Amino acid sequence: MKDINRDEVVRYSNAPFFDNVPENRTRIVVDGRCVCWNATEFALKAYPEVSNVEERYATILWAFFDRLKRTAQRFRTNKFIFAWEGKTNLRKSLYPNYKGNRVPKPTTSEFLTKKRQERKEHRELIDSLAPFWLTIQNEIIPQLGFTNSFSFEGYEGDDIIAMICKNAGNTPIAILSDDSDMYQLISDSVCCVSAMVKSNTVRGRIPSVLDRQKFMKHFKLKPEQWSEFKAVRGCPSDNVPGVLGVGAKYTTLYLNGEPMLKKNGKPITAKLNIELAYKDGTIDLYRKLVKLPFEGTPNVELGLDDFSMEKFLKMCNKYHLSYMIEDEFWADVFGGK
Protein backbone atom coordinates (compact mmCIF):
# COMPACT_ATOMS: atom_id res chain seq x y z
CA MET A 1 0.00 0.00 0.00
CA LYS A 2 1.41 3.35 -1.02
CA ASP A 3 2.13 6.00 1.60
CA ILE A 4 1.19 9.62 1.28
CA ASN A 5 4.02 12.13 1.66
CA ARG A 6 5.53 11.45 5.10
CA ASP A 7 6.77 15.03 5.51
CA GLU A 8 3.21 16.26 5.13
CA VAL A 9 2.02 13.68 7.65
CA VAL A 10 4.51 14.82 10.26
CA ARG A 11 3.60 18.45 9.72
CA TYR A 12 -0.17 18.19 9.82
CA SER A 13 -1.21 14.91 11.43
CA ASN A 14 1.72 13.50 13.36
CA ALA A 15 0.86 10.93 16.01
CA PRO A 16 4.14 9.28 17.11
CA PHE A 17 2.64 6.04 18.42
CA PHE A 18 0.67 5.35 15.23
CA ASP A 19 3.54 6.34 12.94
CA ASN A 20 5.48 3.32 14.22
CA VAL A 21 2.67 0.77 13.93
CA PRO A 22 3.25 -1.98 11.31
CA GLU A 23 1.19 -1.97 8.12
CA ASN A 24 -2.38 -3.31 8.40
CA ARG A 25 -2.14 -3.43 12.19
CA THR A 26 -4.31 -0.36 12.93
CA ARG A 27 -8.09 -0.74 12.71
CA ILE A 28 -10.07 2.22 11.38
CA VAL A 29 -13.42 2.44 13.14
CA VAL A 30 -15.82 4.46 11.00
CA ASP A 31 -18.62 6.55 12.49
CA GLY A 32 -20.92 5.78 9.58
CA ARG A 33 -23.50 8.53 10.00
CA CYS A 34 -20.85 11.20 10.61
CA VAL A 35 -18.83 10.26 7.54
CA CYS A 36 -21.98 10.07 5.40
CA TRP A 37 -22.99 13.53 6.61
CA ASN A 38 -19.58 15.01 5.84
CA ALA A 39 -19.45 13.28 2.47
CA THR A 40 -22.88 14.65 1.57
CA GLU A 41 -22.01 18.17 2.68
CA PHE A 42 -18.75 18.07 0.76
CA ALA A 43 -20.44 16.75 -2.38
CA LEU A 44 -23.05 19.54 -2.28
CA LYS A 45 -20.42 22.26 -1.88
CA ALA A 46 -17.87 20.83 -4.31
CA TYR A 47 -20.40 19.99 -7.04
CA PRO A 48 -23.26 22.52 -6.71
CA GLU A 49 -24.08 22.17 -10.40
CA VAL A 50 -25.14 18.53 -9.95
CA SER A 51 -28.93 18.28 -9.66
CA ASN A 52 -29.65 14.78 -10.93
CA VAL A 53 -30.31 12.51 -7.94
CA GLU A 54 -28.27 9.58 -9.26
CA GLU A 55 -25.31 11.86 -9.95
CA ARG A 56 -25.58 13.29 -6.45
CA TYR A 57 -25.56 9.79 -5.02
CA ALA A 58 -22.43 9.06 -7.04
CA THR A 59 -20.64 12.17 -5.70
CA ILE A 60 -21.66 11.31 -2.13
CA LEU A 61 -20.40 7.76 -2.52
CA TRP A 62 -17.13 8.97 -4.01
CA ALA A 63 -16.66 11.43 -1.11
CA PHE A 64 -17.48 8.68 1.41
CA PHE A 65 -14.88 6.29 0.05
CA ASP A 66 -12.41 9.11 -0.45
CA ARG A 67 -12.45 9.69 3.32
CA LEU A 68 -11.84 5.99 3.92
CA LYS A 69 -8.97 6.06 1.45
CA ARG A 70 -7.26 9.10 2.98
CA THR A 71 -7.48 7.63 6.46
CA ALA A 72 -6.30 4.20 5.32
CA GLN A 73 -3.29 5.76 3.60
CA ARG A 74 -2.50 7.81 6.68
CA PHE A 75 -2.41 4.71 8.90
CA ARG A 76 -1.20 2.24 6.25
CA THR A 77 -4.06 -0.19 6.76
CA ASN A 78 -7.08 -1.71 5.03
CA LYS A 79 -8.80 -2.86 8.21
CA PHE A 80 -12.20 -1.15 8.57
CA ILE A 81 -15.01 -1.46 11.10
CA PHE A 82 -18.27 0.44 10.56
CA ALA A 83 -20.63 1.60 13.32
CA TRP A 84 -24.14 2.90 12.59
CA GLU A 85 -27.06 4.34 14.55
CA GLY A 86 -29.99 2.19 15.64
CA LYS A 87 -33.49 3.30 14.57
CA THR A 88 -34.45 4.04 18.19
CA ASN A 89 -32.49 5.54 21.08
CA LEU A 90 -32.68 4.21 24.64
CA ARG A 91 -31.30 7.46 26.03
CA LYS A 92 -34.63 9.12 25.25
CA SER A 93 -36.27 6.92 27.89
CA LEU A 94 -34.02 8.61 30.47
CA TYR A 95 -34.28 12.10 29.02
CA PRO A 96 -37.04 12.69 26.41
CA ASN A 97 -35.38 15.90 25.18
CA TYR A 98 -32.19 14.06 24.25
CA LYS A 99 -31.17 15.13 20.72
CA GLY A 100 -34.34 17.24 20.60
CA ASN A 101 -34.54 20.24 18.32
CA ARG A 102 -33.78 23.48 20.10
CA VAL A 103 -35.90 26.53 19.26
CA PRO A 104 -33.64 29.47 18.34
CA LYS A 105 -34.10 32.73 20.17
CA PRO A 106 -36.29 35.30 18.36
CA THR A 107 -34.36 37.94 16.44
CA THR A 108 -35.08 41.15 14.56
CA SER A 109 -31.80 40.97 12.63
CA GLU A 110 -32.38 40.51 8.90
CA PHE A 111 -28.86 39.13 8.49
CA LEU A 112 -29.34 36.52 11.23
CA THR A 113 -32.79 35.61 9.92
CA LYS A 114 -31.35 35.08 6.44
CA LYS A 115 -28.50 32.91 7.76
CA ARG A 116 -30.93 30.79 9.76
CA GLN A 117 -33.09 30.28 6.69
CA GLU A 118 -30.05 29.31 4.61
CA ARG A 119 -28.96 26.78 7.26
CA LYS A 120 -32.51 25.41 7.42
CA GLU A 121 -32.67 24.93 3.65
CA HIS A 122 -29.20 23.35 3.61
CA ARG A 123 -30.20 20.95 6.39
CA GLU A 124 -33.39 20.04 4.54
CA LEU A 125 -31.38 19.30 1.40
CA ILE A 126 -29.01 17.03 3.33
CA ASP A 127 -31.97 15.30 5.01
CA SER A 128 -33.51 14.67 1.58
CA LEU A 129 -30.36 12.76 0.59
CA ALA A 130 -29.99 10.90 3.90
CA PRO A 131 -31.98 7.82 2.77
CA PHE A 132 -29.03 7.02 0.51
CA TRP A 133 -26.93 6.61 3.65
CA LEU A 134 -29.02 3.53 4.45
CA THR A 135 -28.16 2.20 1.01
CA ILE A 136 -24.48 2.65 1.83
CA GLN A 137 -24.97 0.95 5.21
CA ASN A 138 -27.24 -1.94 4.26
CA GLU A 139 -26.26 -2.66 0.65
CA ILE A 140 -22.99 -1.19 -0.57
CA ILE A 141 -20.78 -1.86 2.46
CA PRO A 142 -21.80 -5.54 2.89
CA GLN A 143 -21.89 -6.19 -0.87
CA LEU A 144 -18.30 -5.01 -1.14
CA GLY A 145 -17.27 -7.65 1.38
CA PHE A 146 -16.85 -5.50 4.49
CA THR A 147 -17.87 -7.96 7.20
CA ASN A 148 -17.52 -5.74 10.26
CA SER A 149 -20.46 -3.35 9.94
CA PHE A 150 -22.70 -3.05 13.01
CA SER A 151 -25.93 -1.42 14.17
CA PHE A 152 -27.84 -2.29 17.34
CA GLU A 153 -31.42 -1.25 18.03
CA GLY A 154 -31.61 1.36 20.80
CA TYR A 155 -27.93 2.27 20.66
CA GLU A 156 -25.84 4.85 18.86
CA GLY A 157 -22.86 4.23 16.64
CA ASP A 158 -20.86 5.94 19.41
CA ASP A 159 -21.74 3.09 21.79
CA ILE A 160 -20.59 0.46 19.32
CA ILE A 161 -17.32 2.31 18.76
CA ALA A 162 -16.80 2.51 22.52
CA MET A 163 -17.31 -1.25 22.90
CA ILE A 164 -14.82 -1.91 20.10
CA CYS A 165 -12.22 0.30 21.82
CA LYS A 166 -12.98 -1.27 25.20
CA ASN A 167 -12.32 -4.77 23.90
CA ALA A 168 -9.42 -3.93 21.57
CA GLY A 169 -6.65 -4.43 24.12
CA ASN A 170 -3.48 -2.91 22.68
CA THR A 171 -4.69 -3.03 19.08
CA PRO A 172 -4.26 0.47 17.59
CA ILE A 173 -7.61 2.13 16.81
CA ALA A 174 -8.21 5.20 14.64
CA ILE A 175 -11.78 6.53 15.03
CA LEU A 176 -12.94 8.30 11.87
CA SER A 177 -15.42 10.85 13.21
CA ASP A 178 -15.91 14.54 13.97
CA ASP A 179 -18.15 13.82 16.96
CA SER A 180 -16.47 15.22 20.07
CA ASP A 181 -18.20 12.53 22.17
CA MET A 182 -15.47 10.21 20.88
CA TYR A 183 -12.74 12.14 22.67
CA GLN A 184 -13.46 10.21 25.87
CA LEU A 185 -12.27 7.05 24.07
CA ILE A 186 -8.81 8.43 23.29
CA SER A 187 -5.97 6.49 24.93
CA ASP A 188 -2.36 5.55 24.27
CA SER A 189 -3.57 3.28 21.44
CA VAL A 190 -6.77 5.09 20.35
CA CYS A 191 -6.91 8.35 18.40
CA CYS A 192 -9.62 10.36 16.65
CA VAL A 193 -9.37 11.35 12.99
CA SER A 194 -11.39 14.13 11.38
CA ALA A 195 -13.65 13.13 8.50
CA MET A 196 -13.78 16.70 7.20
CA VAL A 197 -12.01 17.78 4.03
CA LYS A 198 -12.41 21.53 3.80
CA SER A 199 -10.25 22.33 0.80
CA ASN A 200 -7.84 20.98 -1.77
CA THR A 201 -4.81 22.18 0.17
CA VAL A 202 -2.21 19.87 1.67
CA ARG A 203 -3.82 20.35 5.05
CA GLY A 204 -7.20 19.46 3.60
CA ARG A 205 -5.92 16.30 1.93
CA ILE A 206 -4.49 14.76 5.09
CA PRO A 207 -6.80 13.80 7.96
CA SER A 208 -6.03 15.65 11.17
CA VAL A 209 -5.30 13.33 14.10
CA LEU A 210 -6.11 13.90 17.77
CA ASP A 211 -4.14 11.57 20.04
CA ARG A 212 -3.81 11.55 23.82
CA GLN A 213 -0.91 14.00 23.92
CA LYS A 214 -2.61 16.54 21.65
CA PHE A 215 -5.90 16.23 23.52
CA MET A 216 -4.32 16.95 26.89
CA LYS A 217 -2.35 19.88 25.51
CA HIS A 218 -5.40 21.47 23.90
CA PHE A 219 -8.13 20.82 26.48
CA LYS A 220 -6.04 20.79 29.69
CA LEU A 221 -7.84 17.59 30.66
CA LYS A 222 -7.29 13.85 30.38
CA PRO A 223 -9.50 11.98 27.89
CA GLU A 224 -10.95 10.03 30.83
CA GLN A 225 -12.38 13.32 32.13
CA TRP A 226 -14.17 14.20 28.91
CA SER A 227 -17.51 12.53 29.67
CA GLU A 228 -17.60 14.30 33.04
CA PHE A 229 -16.72 17.55 31.28
CA LYS A 230 -19.70 17.11 28.94
CA ALA A 231 -21.99 16.17 31.82
CA VAL A 232 -21.14 19.42 33.62
CA ARG A 233 -20.62 21.73 30.63
CA GLY A 234 -23.39 20.21 28.54
CA CYS A 235 -23.52 18.88 25.00
CA PRO A 236 -25.44 21.21 22.67
CA SER A 237 -25.43 18.78 19.73
CA ASP A 238 -27.24 16.17 21.87
CA ASN A 239 -29.39 18.78 23.64
CA VAL A 240 -27.89 17.95 27.05
CA PRO A 241 -28.03 21.31 28.87
CA GLY A 242 -25.31 20.89 31.51
CA VAL A 243 -25.13 23.08 34.60
CA LEU A 244 -26.74 26.51 34.26
CA GLY A 245 -24.25 29.34 33.87
CA VAL A 246 -21.18 27.08 33.67
CA GLY A 247 -18.96 27.18 30.59
CA ALA A 248 -15.87 25.29 29.46
CA LYS A 249 -13.45 27.41 31.51
CA TYR A 250 -15.10 26.83 34.88
CA THR A 251 -15.84 23.18 34.11
CA THR A 252 -12.15 22.58 33.43
CA LEU A 253 -11.11 24.41 36.59
CA TYR A 254 -13.55 22.38 38.66
CA LEU A 255 -12.54 18.99 37.26
CA ASN A 256 -8.87 19.79 37.78
CA GLY A 257 -9.49 20.83 41.38
CA GLU A 258 -8.25 24.36 40.81
CA PRO A 259 -9.37 27.34 42.94
CA MET A 260 -12.72 28.89 42.00
CA LEU A 261 -12.86 31.75 44.49
CA LYS A 262 -13.82 35.40 44.51
CA LYS A 263 -11.39 38.03 45.76
CA ASN A 264 -13.00 37.76 49.19
CA GLY A 265 -12.22 34.04 49.30
CA LYS A 266 -15.80 32.82 48.81
CA PRO A 267 -16.66 30.28 46.06
CA ILE A 268 -17.83 31.76 42.77
CA THR A 269 -21.42 31.09 41.69
CA ALA A 270 -20.35 28.58 39.01
CA LYS A 271 -18.74 26.33 41.61
CA LEU A 272 -21.82 26.46 43.83
CA ASN A 273 -24.03 25.56 40.86
CA ILE A 274 -21.82 22.60 39.96
CA GLU A 275 -21.79 21.31 43.53
CA LEU A 276 -25.58 21.60 43.72
CA ALA A 277 -25.94 19.69 40.44
CA TYR A 278 -23.87 16.85 41.90
CA LYS A 279 -25.94 16.79 45.07
CA ASP A 280 -29.37 16.78 43.42
CA GLY A 281 -28.52 14.05 40.90
CA THR A 282 -28.49 16.25 37.80
CA ILE A 283 -24.92 15.28 36.91
CA ASP A 284 -25.72 11.59 37.43
CA LEU A 285 -28.43 11.86 34.76
CA TYR A 286 -26.31 13.83 32.31
CA ARG A 287 -23.39 11.44 32.82
CA LYS A 288 -25.56 8.48 31.79
CA LEU A 289 -26.46 10.34 28.60
CA VAL A 290 -22.93 11.34 27.54
CA LYS A 291 -20.73 8.52 28.83
CA LEU A 292 -19.81 5.79 26.35
CA PRO A 293 -20.83 3.06 25.95
CA PHE A 294 -24.45 3.31 27.11
CA GLU A 295 -25.41 0.66 29.63
CA GLY A 296 -26.32 -2.63 27.97
CA THR A 297 -24.51 -2.06 24.67
CA PRO A 298 -23.93 -5.51 23.09
CA ASN A 299 -20.45 -6.82 22.49
CA VAL A 300 -19.11 -6.82 18.95
CA GLU A 301 -17.78 -9.99 17.31
CA LEU A 302 -15.29 -9.17 14.55
CA GLY A 303 -14.85 -11.31 11.46
CA LEU A 304 -12.65 -11.44 8.37
CA ASP A 305 -13.51 -9.29 5.36
CA ASP A 306 -14.48 -11.02 2.14
CA PHE A 307 -13.06 -8.71 -0.54
CA SER A 308 -12.93 -9.42 -4.24
CA MET A 309 -12.28 -7.33 -7.33
CA GLU A 310 -15.49 -8.70 -8.84
CA LYS A 311 -17.61 -7.17 -6.05
CA PHE A 312 -15.76 -3.89 -6.29
CA LEU A 313 -16.17 -3.61 -10.07
CA LYS A 314 -19.88 -4.41 -9.80
CA MET A 315 -20.40 -1.56 -7.32
CA CYS A 316 -18.33 0.91 -9.34
CA ASN A 317 -20.22 0.13 -12.53
CA LYS A 318 -23.60 0.41 -10.81
CA TYR A 319 -22.81 3.86 -9.39
CA HIS A 320 -20.70 5.13 -12.31
CA LEU A 321 -17.46 5.32 -10.31
CA SER A 322 -15.03 4.50 -13.10
CA TYR A 323 -12.30 6.65 -11.55
CA MET A 324 -12.27 4.39 -8.49
CA ILE A 325 -11.63 1.39 -10.73
CA GLU A 326 -8.49 3.10 -11.97
CA ASP A 327 -7.35 3.97 -8.44
CA GLU A 328 -4.37 1.81 -7.44
CA PHE A 329 -5.28 2.07 -3.76
CA TRP A 330 -8.66 0.36 -4.15
CA ALA A 331 -7.19 -2.16 -6.56
CA ASP A 332 -4.77 -3.14 -3.78
CA VAL A 333 -7.57 -3.43 -1.21
CA PHE A 334 -10.10 -5.41 -3.22
CA GLY A 335 -7.56 -7.26 -5.29
CA GLY A 336 -6.06 -8.66 -2.12
CA LYS A 337 -2.58 -7.29 -2.73
Regions found by a protein language model. Name each.
Residues 2-174, 187-200, 205, 291, ...:
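Noncatalytic, basic helical substrate-engagement surface that gates or grips nucleic-acid strands
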Residues 153, 164-165, 175-242, 253:
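Long, highly charged, low-complexity intrinsically disordered interaction regions
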Residues 222-300, 321-325, 331:
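Accessory alpha-helical DNA-binding modules that contact the DNA backbone or grooves
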Residues 313-337:
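Long, highly charged low-complexity segments enriched in Glu/Asp and Lys/Arg with interspersed Ser/Thr
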